[in-house]
From Swiss-Prot:
Cell compartments where the protein resides: Nucleus, Nucleolus
Source organism phylogeny: Eukaryota, Amoebozoa, Evosea, Eumycetozoa, Dictyostelia
Organism annotation: Dictyostelium discoideum (Social amoeba)
GO molecular function: RNA binding; snoRNA binding; telomerase RNA binding
Protein name: H/ACA ribonucleoprotein complex subunit 3
Gene3D superfamilies according to UniProt: H/ACA ribonucleoprotein complex, subunit Nop10 (2.20.28.40)
Family: Belongs to the NOP10 family.
Amino acid sequence: MHLMYYNDKDGQRVYTLKKESPNHEATYSAHPARFSVDDKYSRERIALKKRFGLLLTQQPPLEF
């Protein structure tokens, strides 16, 4: 059993242990993804971000 959540009609998160909401929609995991120090795919992820212009250095500067 894992902690799950769904969004109610007001947009608020409702936490539950069930796999589907009362509206018969799938619930989402409330746990963050695992972080591994041994990141095998970081080189590929950076290459894809560079190719599609998604790196922060490729974005226009933020104005405050």
